[in-house]
Swiss-Prot record:
Disulfide bonds: none
Top-level taxon of origin: Eukaryota
Coiled-coil boundaries: 840-1935
Name of the encoding gene: Myh7
Protein's recorded name: Myosin-7
Span of domain Myosin motor: 85-778
Lineage, highest ranks first: Eukaryota, Metazoa, Chordata, Craniata, Vertebrata
Known role: Myosins are actin-based motor molecules with ATPase activity essential for muscle contraction. Forms regular bipolar thick filaments that, together with actin thin filaments, constitute the fundamental contractile unit of skeletal and cardiac muscle.
Phosphotyrosine: modified positions: Y1308
Keyword Hydrolase: no
Sites bearing Phosphothreonine, chain numbering: T378, T1282, T1309, T1513
Occurrences of domain Myosin N-terminal SH3-like (ranges): 32-81
PROSITE patterns per record: IQ (PS50096), MYOSIN_MOTOR (PS51456), SH3_LIKE (PS51844)
CDD domains, per the entry: MYSc_class_II (cd01377)
Naturally occurring in which organism (per UniProt): Rattus norvegicus (Rat)
Residue positions where Phosphoserine is found in the record: S1137, S1269, S1510
Length: 1935
């Protein structure tokens, strides 16, 4: 990446990559590969040095510091060449060893480049200063960049993970490890920041956020401050050290947008809560609270702002310079707000934190003479108990005297001070840990959104390997975790290496380096390993650390190589055993391991926590079960509670979960390194860094790299860089493939040829070989440079010598000139010349000056003009520049808009494809959903049956209540009789009072009477006491009666509530069903099918609505019954008060009477016993009803869970199908690419054919030139023979051409047959797949039948169970009716009933077991069905692929048909040529006949000549020789004549043979043409049939849509009737629905318009195809014309005929052109019409969008109204709570008054009756007030329920409206897509029309040129004719 490219990174560029200048300087640095080395050093680990000498296996070297050292040769390690200085990926180092890695990191760190790659790792060094490499500019620069395209950075790792997730559709993980202070937390924050920026959900998240909460991105980012406050602390190395590990999963949607997040935590250092080292401090939250930023918090927690007041937090430092605790506290508090914590939750967290502070200050002392602790002051205990919601005395008692279970009894145990202190520390740690885990769970709940999520990226921030002087249990857990992670890395790394080798085709034996660490892992985690032995020892009560050590030694010492006995060194902590880890040997001290692993708590205090009034604390310990947790009845073994699980077991469980998560992801590794322990920026401590490199696996990774081929270079780069080693191997100017060149080059070098391998694209090197090649290259370069220097020096010296020679020559010339001048200077003429010469020059200079002045004036004027012109131009230029900039901005904006539009278009096309695929999937899933629908209806029927059973139970209860009321009336009658008897007694009491008064008057008269009266008073007091007891008993019996009544009412309310719950669940199921129906309707609407099923669903919906009405009516009836019950209860209460009042009056009378009847007491006791029996029976009945209701609820929950699992399974199937779809897409792309290659190859062959035809035409033209020599026939008769030979050769060529054409035809037919055969095979394969699919479906049906049988069996079992329950109910009713009459039989029946109940419970358990087995079989069958469905999907996909192949073969057939037509046209042209040849033959025949006539004339002339010769022979005997020669000529001519005759006969025979061939070809052509026409007709019929079918489907869909709208309107009307209370809101919603219906109508109209436009487009496309065919015909005819024109040059007559034909064809083409023009104009008109339609569609779409927005606004208003109603509901709840509080106060006052009443009764003994009556009146008033308050409370509860129901209905309605709006939006988007597609098609049609016009113009132009050439040829032929005539005439004259 060049410097200009690095400019994108802004100010961070210098901190990320070296500049080009630095790289050049580094490469030119002097370097000697043999001498420059690393040597070991005690302080610095390794130092750079130069070798001085080598002797006897030892090396002497001089270090950089000038120090001379001698070391062994195997300790010396070579340095890397300067090319590798500050390399970004250390795996590319040619010498890959520890010092090379160390110095590369050190040099990069010195340049502040803190990120470096090491193979798969990214190593980061903590800079201890701020660097500008995390800003928004850097984030933008890394976005979308590959790893190789950008410098190393945590953003690059994050972006690669994000891109891999989107492209590979696989979960990713980023593993960030390192020591404390290395920067893990900061890098984790940066990763989260990067994802929050690039994958933000944007506006949607802002709309969705609730008031007070942030967006999802804010919440993810703000989770860190909250967790850091409670999980981070200051350590020696780091001011903000994370004392826990975390795995943050960030979930994304299918498009890569943020969906949700969750956090898992590991190994929180809870010991820090109570203990810190001197240089460290506790968790930040304690000091943040003490910072006094929120004073009200200090008051609430009862603490001061001085940390030293609290023992737990003042053991180390209390302030940190780099942290502002007050600001951090505000950040923590605001983070809680953003994360949605309620004020109650925040206060609970702060209270528990404050309680831990006070825990540390609790003091205890030893009791005298006892080993027993007691509190030393209770102030701190009171504070902590108050904050925790506990009783202080109970807390102290639990700490000092805990209860311990011994056998089956609990015993109080004494604790000493040390044990109490340990218990306090353990409780504080446990509270803090559980609170931290609760916070993580609460944050996860906030980050869990309801948005769909597809993939996640996990970020693991966990402590690295630890080797300290004192290593304990915590270090073992951390090191074990890192051992597992390192094994995971090793395995993953070499799996990737192997994949690379496999991809490159390199032979490689796989070595699983993950197994190297298996021995150590097994030693720790396997059975009888360290962890299992530790857990085993924890179970034994007498086990100690030493017994644990002994067991370890017995099992592992000497048996495992990784387990060793340590060597203890003085001054260091004692170690008990050593483990050999991958990072080194670690000595472990086992003191306190058993205690740490068990981590016991004071269970008495934990029990107090569980009962705490602080809700958070009780929730934290709600699931805690100690060591004595009870055994589960259903299982054989005891199972401890989750809270008592050992630390090691819990850690292993969490670690296994983490490893499972990581294995399911694609990992990325980041290793953080701390450079020094002083936190100094830029300083690197070499031993510390080397220790970390060993610990974090970087050197382990390098070790693995060295086993393979760590260095690899692309062939092109290798050839370019190392060609210099042997240029002869790759010659210049000769093209050689890069791989072959690299093979030749490496083969020619003197190196070990086993050290490299050749891949497909790269050459791979073992470690060190590349350095050797670099050394050879440097040597070669030095030799070349030396040679260049020598040559350049020679050239320079030669140039210098040449200059010296030139100087010498010039000196000689100057000397000669001076000598000549000295010889002539004294001549008189010369002197005269010297005088005149200056004068001449002065005159000339004056003229020149004058001219120059004039010129200066002109130039000055011109300059002024040019200046003015320049200014004008500059002004113009400025304005033009401004315009240019404006235009550029406009162009840029247009380009951006265009790019955005293209992106949107591409995205929409992709979405369309995905939606089409989803539509296909949904059609296949439709049947499954219908089956699920049927199952739901069956379950609904079952629930209805259960509801009816519950109603029957309620009726039974009501009957029992009626019986109880009757009995009560009977008792009331008895009470009335008693009152009548009491009235008689009252009269007696009146008489007695009179006598008493008389006695009192005579009191003074007689002391004896007084004594008697005193005795009477004593007896009366005794009677009063007895009567009071009786009254108390009666009141107790009344209270019990009241309680029974209350219990019955409570049971009734509970049953009514359960009934409501079941009804609500039914309503929810019905709502879910309606949603499923709507989805089905939507899918039917999209798929254009299944109209009948939709009507069924609508009928079912109407039935459900009827049922809903019935249920609502039933609810109203129940509410009325409840009201009646309440009124009856009020009457009973009133009656009770009257009775109590009457009883009190009776008691007063009895008191005075002093008598009591034992009979009444016995009757009261009997009644009381009967009431108690009835109460017990009713309680049993209510318990059983509650059990049945709970069972029903459980069944309902199970059914809901099953539905959820089925939905999850369907989603998984969907994901699998999408994956297979993408794979098939890839296969299809491969096939299409192969087809394109075949088409290209075919085009190349056609080009070759054309070139051959051109060559043939050239040969023809040459042949024609040879034919011109025919004109010399008149002069030489011998040329006839050559002309005949030329003609025969042409005939042979034509024969060859015809045979070639026939061969091509045969090959084409053969290929056509092959294609047909392939098509038949594909059809057979498709049929086979269809058969397999049918068989799979058959198997699926069988499995479904089996499943149905199982469900029927389950239903039968449930029926048996219900029967048993009914029998139980019958026995119970029987027992209740006969209870009063037969007590003995009742007891026996009770025993039998108990036995029957036990049997029934056993039967229920058996049934449940069978149900669970049936559920398992059901799940198994479901899985098999899913597998079968997957097979079906695959077979469907294969069938679809076969269909695609068939379509491709159809296309190929069409292409072959076109080729056949072309061959047919060529055949026609060959026929024409044959005809022309026949005409030429005819001409030749004529010429031959003429030649015969000439021959006869020649014979005659010959005879005449012979006669003359004979005459001459007689005269001249000497002329014999000439006669003999003439005779020879004659013989030759005769032979030539014979040859010509034979040639002519052969030509005639060949012509006849060719004519026969042509006839046969014509017949075959006619047959094939007829067959093709027949097939085309069949195809047209099929197309028409399909079109008709589609139209029928569209009509059916239209009808279904109308039915749907009608049913929707009907449903809306029903809703209007049901929602009478919300008329205004319903009006708005119905208006929105009407708008939606109008939008649907508009959509229909748009669809019809789109169909019309589609038809028009199809017509246009067809017209366009016709145009193309016409143009192809014109082009072919043009070729024919050219061929005929070339033939015209040879034969003039043929030229004239062809010209006539051309004129005819020209007329035809002109007519066709006119047709084309007309078609083009019609196309343009259609385009205009389509544009108008498109604009209309766009306006309509915009209107629909506007209507959607209006509907959205109305929905928002509805939501605000719902929120207002929710507020009203909250107010109602507050008022009800207030009334409840008032009720409690009233009850308290009643109790007080009762107490006062008792006191008043005692006072009444002394004569205070009036006061008692007043108090009773007051009590009655208070009871009336209480009844009124209870009525009001009941009314408010009723109103609250109504409002809750109304809110639910409103939310449901708003949800429905939102779904409608979403559907409308989808429709609008689809319409816009179609509109764009039609636009694009129209534009393409216009472009094609324009191209056709241009082609037509081109053809017309070529035709004109052809005509011109024909005219020229005709003129040339005429000239040749004239010439031939002249030559013939001349020849005749000469003869």
């Amino acid at each position: 990446m060049a410097d200009r490219e690095m400019a994108a990174f802004g100010a961070g560029a210098p901190f990320l990559r070296k500049s080009e200048k630095e790289r050049l300087e580094a490469q030119t640095r002097p370097f000697d590969l043999k001498k420059d080395v690393f040597v070991p050093d005690d302080k610095e680990e390794f130092v750079k040095a130069k070798i001085v000498s080598r002797e006897g296996g030892k090396v002497t070297a001089e270090t950089e510091n000038g120090k001379t050292v001698t070391v062994k040769e195997d300790q010396v390690m070579q340095q890397n060449p300067p090319k590798f200085d500050k390399i970004e990926d250390m795996a590319m180092l040619t010498f890959l060893h520890e010092p090379a890695v160390l110095y590369n990191l050190k040099e990069r760190y010195a340049s502040w480049m803190i990120y470096t790659y090491s193979g798969l790792f990214c190593v980061t060094v903590n800079p201890y200063k701020w660097l500008p490499v995390y800003n928004a500019q850097v984030v933008a620069a890394y976005r979308g960049k590959k790893r190789s395209e950008a410098p190393p950075h945590i953003f690059s790792i994050s972006d690669n993970a994000y891109q891999y997730m989107l492209t590979d559709r696989e979960n990713q993980s980023i593993l960030i490890t390192g020591e404390s202070g290395a920067g893990k937390t900061v890098n984790t924050k940066r990763v989260i920041q990067y994802f929050a920026v690039i994958a933000a959900i944007g506006d949607r998240s802002k709309k969705d956020q609730t008031p007070g909460k942030g967006t999802l991105e804010d919440q993810i980012i703000q989770a860190n401050p909250a967790l850091e406050a409670f999980g981070n602390a200051k350590t020696v190395r780091n001011d903000n050290s994370s004392r826990f590990g975390k795995f943050i999963r960030i979930h994304f949607g299918a498009t890569g947008k943020l969906a949700s997040a969750d956090i898992e935590t590991y190994l929180l250092e809870k010991s820090r809560v109570i203990f810190q080292l001197k240089a460290e401090r506790d968790y930040h939250i304690f000091y943040q609270i003490l910072s006094n930023k929120k004073p009200e918090l200090l008051d609430m927690l009862l603490i001061t702002n001085n940390p030293y007041d609290y023992a737990f937090f003042s053991q180390g430092e209390t302030t940190v310079a780099s942290i502002d605790d007050s600001e951090e506290h505000m950040a923590t508090d605001s983070a809680f707000d953003v994360l949605g914590f309620t004020p109650e939750e925040k206060n609970s967290i702060y209270k528990l934190t404050g309680a831990i502070m006070h825990f540390g200050n609790m003091k205890f002392k030893q009791k005298q003479r006892e080993e027993q602790a007691e509190p030393d002051g209770t102030e701190e205990a009171d504070k902590s108990a108050y904050l925790m919601g506990l009783n202080s005395a109970d807390l102290l008692k639990g700490l000092c005297h805990p209860r311990v279970k011994v056998g089956n009894e609990y015993v109080t145990k004494g604790q000493n001070v040390q044990q109490v202190a340990y218990a306090i520390g353990a409780l504080a740690k446990s509270v803090y840990e559980k609170m931290f885990n609760w916070m993580v769970t609460r944050i996860n709940a906030t980050l869990e959104t309801k948005q769909p999520r597809q993939y996640f990226i996990g970020v693991l921030d966990i402590a690295g390997f630890e080797i300290f002087d004192f290593n304990s249990f915590e270090q073992l857990c951390i090191n074990f975790t890192n051992e597992k992670l390192q094994q995971f890395f090793n395995h993953h790394m070499f799996v990737l290496e192997q994949e690379e080798y496999k991809k490159e085709g390199i032979e490689w034996t796989f070595i699983d380096f993950g197994m190297d660490l298996q021995a150590c892992i097994d030693l720790i985690e396997k059975p009888m390993g360290i962890m299992s032995i530790l857990e085993e020892e924890c179970m034994f009560p007498k086990a100690t650390d030493m017994t644990f050590k002994a067991k370890l030694y017995d099992n592992h010492l000497g048996k495992s190589n990784n387990f060793q006995k340590p060597r203890n060194i003085k001054g260091k902590q004692e170690a008990h055993f050593s483990l050999i880890h991958y990072a080194g040997t670690v000595d472990y001290n086992i003191l306190g391991w058993l205690q740490k692993n068990k981590d016991p708590l004071n269970e008495t205090v934990v029990g107090l926590y569980q009962k705490s009034s602080l809700k958070l604390l009780s929730n934290l310990f709600a699931n805690y079960a100690g060591a004595d947790a009870p055994v589960d009845k259903g299982k054989g073994k005891a199972k401890k509670g989750s809270s008592f699980q050992t630390v090691s077991a819990l850690h292993r469980e969490n670690l296994n979960k983490l490893m499972t998560n990581l294995r399911s992801t694609h990992p990325h590794f980041v290793r953080c390194i701390i450079p020094n322990e002083t936190k100094s920026p830029g300083v690197m401590d070499n031993p510390l860094v080397m220790h970390q490199l060993r610990c974090n696996g970087v050197l382990e990774g390098i070790r693995i790299c060295r086993k393979g081929f760590p260095n690899r270079i692309l062939y092109g780069d290798f050839r370019q860089r190392y060609r210099i080693l042997n240029p002869a191997a790759i010659p210049e100017g000769q093209f050689i493939d890069s791989r072959k060149g690299a093979e030749k080059l490496l083969g020619s070098l003197d190196i070990d040829h086993n050290q490299y391998k050749f891949g497909h694209t790269k050459v791979f090197f073992k470690a060190g070989l590349l350095g050797l090649l670099e050394e050879m290259r440097d040597e070669r370069l030095s030799r070349i440079i030396t040679r260049i220097q020598a040559q350049s020096r020679g050239v320079l010296s030669r140039m210098e010598f040449k200059k010296l020679l030139e100087r010498r020559d010039s000196l000689l010339i100057i000397q000669w000139n001076i000598r000549a001048f000295m010889g002539v200077k004294n001549w008189p003429w010369m002197k005269l010349y010297f005088k005149i010469k200056p004068l001449l020059k002065s005159a000339e200079t004056e003229k020149e000056m004058a001219n120059m002045k004039e010129e200066f004036g002109r130039v000055k004027d011109a300059l002024e003009k040019s200046e003015a012109r320049r200014k004008e131009l500059e002004e113009k230029m400025v304005s033009l520049l401004q315009e240019k900039n404006d235009l550029q901005l406009q162009v840029q904006a247009e380009q951006d808009n265009l790019a955005d539009a293209e992106e949107r278009c591409d995205q929409l096309i992709k979405n369309k494809i995905q939606l089409e695929a989803k539509v296909k999937e949904m059609t296949e899933r439709l049947e499954d959903e219908e089956e699920m629908n049927a199952e739901l209806t069956a379950k609904k029927r079952k629930l209805e049956d259960e509801c009816s059973e519950l109603k029957r139970d309620i009726d039974d209860l009501e009957l029992t209540l009626a019986k109880v009321e009757k009995e009560k009336h009977a008792t009331e009658n008895k009470v009335k009789n008693l009152t009548e008897e009491m009235a008689g007694l009252d009269e007696i009491i009146v008489k007695l009072t009179k006598e008493k008064k008389a006695l009192q008057e005579a009191h003074q008269q007689a002391l004896d009477d007084l004594q008697a009266e005193e005795d009477k008073v004593n007896t009366l007091t005794k009677a009063k006491v007895k009567l009071e007891q009786q009254v108390d008993d009666l009141e107790g019996s009344l209270d019990q009666d009241k309680k029974v009544r209350m219990d019955l009412e409570r049971a009734k309310r509970k049953l009514e509530g359960d009934l409501k719950l079941t009804q609500e669940s039914i309503m929810d199921l019905e709502n879910d069903k309606q949603q499923l129906d709507e989805r089905l309707k939507k899918k039917d609407f999209e798929l254009n099918a299944l109209n009948a099923r939709i009507e069924d669903e609508q009928a079912l919906g109407s039935q459900l609505q009827k049922k809903l009405k019935e249920l609502q009516a039933r609810i109203e009836e129940l509410e009325e019954e409840l009201e009646a019950e309440r009124t009856a209860r009020a009457k009973v209460e009133k009656l009770r008060s009257d009775l109590s009042r009457e009883l009190e009056e009776i008691s007063e009378r009895l008191e005075e009477a002093g008598g009591a009847t034992s009979v009444q007491i016995e009757m009261n006791k009997k009644r009381e016993a009967e009431f108690q029996k009835m109460r017990r029976d009713l309680e049993e009945a209510t318990l059983q009803h509650e059990a049945t209701a709970a069972a029903l609820r459980k069944k309902h929950a199970d059914s809901v869970a099953e539905l959820g699992e089925q939905i999850d399974n369907l989603q998984r199937v969907k994901q699998k199908l999408e994956k297979e779809k993408s794979e098939f897409k890839l296969e299809l792309d491969d096939v299409t690419s192969n087809m394109e290659q075949i088409i290209k190859a075919k085009a190349n062959l056609e080009k070759m054919c054309r070139t051959l035809e051109d060559q043939m035409n050239e040969h023809r033209s040459k042949a024609e030139e040879t034919q011109r020599s025919v004109n010399d026939l008149t002069r030489q008769r011998a040329k006839l023979q050559t002309e005949n030979g030329e003609l025969s050769r042409q005939l042979d060529e034509k024969e060859a051409l015809i045979s070639q054409l026939t061969r091509g035809k045969l090959t084409y037919t053969q290929q056509l047959e092959d294609l047909k055969r392939q098509l038949e095979e594909e059809v057979k394969a498709k049929n086979a797949l269809a058969h397999a699919l049918q068989s799979a479906r058959h198997d699926c049906d069988l499995l479904r039948e089996q499943y149905e049988e199982e469900t029927e069996a389950k239903a039968e079992l449930q029926r048996v169970l219900s029967k048993a329950n009914s029998e139980v109910a019958q026995w119970r009713t029987k027992y209740e009716t006969d209870a009063i009459q037969r007590t003995e039989e009742l007891e026996e029946a009770k025993k039998k009933l108990a036995q029957r109940l036990q049997d029934a419970e056993e039967a229920v358990e058996a049934v449940n077991a069978k149900c669970s087995s049936l559920e398992k079989t059901k799940h198994r069958l479901q899985n098999e069905i899913e597998d079968l469905m997957v097979d079906v999907e695959r077979s469907n996909a294969a069938a679809a692929a076969l269909d695609k192949k068939q379509r491709n073969f159809d296309k190929i057939l069409v292409e072959w048909k076109q080729k056949y037509e072309e061959s047919q046209s060529e055949l026609e042209s060959s026929q024409k040529e044959a005809r022309s040849l026949s005409t030429e033959l005819f001409k030749l025949k004529n010429a031959y006949e003429e030649s015969l006539e000439h021959l006869e004339t020649f014979k005659r002339e010959n005879k005449n000549l012979q006669e003359e010769i004979s005459d001459l022979t007689e005269q001249l005997g000497s002329t014999g020789k000439s006669i003999h020669e003439l005779e020879k000529i004659r013989k030759q001519l005769e032979a030539e004549k014979l040859e010509l005759q034979s040639a002519l006969e052969e030509a005639e025979a060949s012509l006849e043979h060719e004519e026969g061939k042509i006839l046969r070809a014509q017949l075959e052509f006619n047959q094939i043409k007829a067959e093709i026409e027949r097939k085309l007709a069949e195809k047209d019929e099929e197309m028409e049939q399909a079109k008709r079918n589609h139209l029928r489907v569209v009509d059916s869909l239209q009808t279904s849509l109308d039915a749907e709208t009608r049913s929707r309107n009907e449903a809306l009307r029903v809703k209007k009737k049901m929602e009478g209370d919300l008329n205004e809101m319903e009006i708005q919603l119905s208006h929105a629905n009407r708008m939606a219906a109008e939008a649907q109508k508009q959509v229909k109209s748009l669809q019809s318009l789109l169909k019309d436009t589609q038809i028009q487009l199809d017509d246009a496309v067809r017209a366009n195809d016709d145009l193309k065919e016409n143009i192809a015909i014109v082009e072919r005819r043009n070729n024919l014309l050219q061929a005929e024109l070339e033939e015209l040059r040879a034969v003039v007559e043929q030229t004239e005929r062809s010209r006539k034909l051309a004129e005819q064809e020209l007329i035809e083409t002109s007519e066709r052109v006119q047709l084309l023009h007309s078609q083009n104009t019609s196309l343009i008109n259609q385009k205009k019409k389509m544009d108008a339609d498109l604009s209309q569609l766009q306006t309509e779409v915009e209107e629909a969008v506007q209507e959607c927005r209006n509907a959205e606004e109305k929905a928002k208003k509805a939501i605000t109204d719902a929120a207002m109603m929710a507020e009203e509901l909250k107010k109602e709840q507050d008022t009800s709570a207030h009334l409840e509080r008032m009720k409690n106060n009233m009850e308290q006052t009643i109790k007080d008054l009762q107490h006062r009443l008792d006191e008043a009764e005692q006072i009444a003994l002394k004569g205070g009756k009036k006061q008692l009556q007043k108090l009773e009146a007051r009590v009655r008033e208070l009871e009336n007030e209480l009844e009124a308050e209870q009525k009001r409370n009941a009314e408010s509860v009723k109103g609250m329920r109504k409002s809750e129901r109304r809110i639910k209905e409103l939310t449901y309605q708003t949800e429905e409206d939102r779904k409608n709006l979403l559907r409308l939006q989808d429709l609008v988007d689809k319409l816009q897509l179609k509109v764009k597609a039609y636009k694009r098609q129209a534009e393409e049609a216009e472009e094609q029309a324009n191209t056709n016009l241009s082609k037509f113009r081109k053809v017309q132009h070529e035709l004109d040129e052809a005509e011109e050439r024909a005219d020229i040829a005709e003129s040339q032929v005429n000239k040749l004719r004239a010439k031939s005539r002249d030559i013939g005439a001349k020849g005749l004259n000469e003869e």
